[in-house]
Structure formats: C-alpha cells, structure tokens
Amino acid sequence: KKAFMGCSGISMLSGMTTEIAAEVKVNEVMIQNVTEDVYLLADHTKIGKNSSFTSSPIQGIKHLITDEKAPQDVLDELRSAGVLIHQVHKGDFER
C-alpha cells in the first residue's frame, strides 16, 4: 500500500505539517499503515513552510511531488535528508 497525501507545509524544521489538528491523527494512521512509500503532494507555496501541527517528521516522507516553482534551496535540503523530489512542469501537460 502506498499513501498519497497533501499538507499545509513541508520543511526540514517541522516535517509534514497541517493547519487542522484533527488531520494529524488521520495522517499518522495513514502513514503507519503504508507498506510501501508515502508520497506527499505540495505545490510551491507549501515548500519550506511550517504550519501549526506536525503530522510526520521529514524522515517519514520518501517522495515529494511538487511544481516547477518550488524553491530549489529547500528542495536540495529535503533531497539531502533522503526525500526523492518529483517536479512537475507546466509543459508536461501541454500538447
């Protein structure tokens, strides 16, 4: 089982965060029940941001799917922590 999850923010300092306290327990249960990897989906506005509640430390996230506007310095930090970065480019969807 894989998990594809959203968040309010992701950073080296706080890991995967949310603004909604009730989401923390749901996210923790999802992560605990994964037999493969956790894929976090976060657009550039959430990269390097810390929200109120931590759902997972950065070590619990194996993949980050984000867009081409994500700050490269933060992506490099996440990469150095073992997170695999998958950047989606607008041109990928144009015909």
Where are these regions (language model features)?
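Conserved phosphate- and dinucleotide-binding cores of soluble alpha/beta proteins
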Residues: 1-95
